[in-house]
């Protein structure tokens, strides 16, 4: 009898374990593909001048541009905002674990000054990859859940980039963590592949 009495508890616990909910980024401005990942990280497509007031209102202190081509969009959109602007150029078809680690470390460093916005052109692929890795490394999401948000979230991921999906292997994630540890060990030196942020007033 005692076993039957406990059975509903086991079933309930198992159901809860299977339905653990990992909350995707919260929409802020849909037409800018702007979402809040957490208190210190936002994601979007390439900002335009009309986005500047909102970005500042959100308390964003740093904007990191992942675009490889046409890198001056942030200067045009955010001139006079006082926001620190960084270029961290990535070619979508040639992103390596060390590039991911470098970008995550830049986000980590800049978050000590306030919220960070990371973007590429569409805010879907390179940005989606970085947010997924941020989920794994800093928020301790299961790899499958972080990858699912990147692929299935409302951000417009382009399935052509199968190489990005392959970066979720255990080996690549271990390399990312190892490289991050190395970068933290040399935290007082800002060296390539970083570019120093420009504050534009």
Residue ranges with predicted function:
Residues 120:
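Short cysteine clusters
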Residues 126:
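Conserved lysine of the Walker
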Residues 4-13:
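Bacterial N-terminal signal peptides
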Residues 16-116, 129-201:
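Cys-dependent protein tyrosine phosphatase-like superfamily
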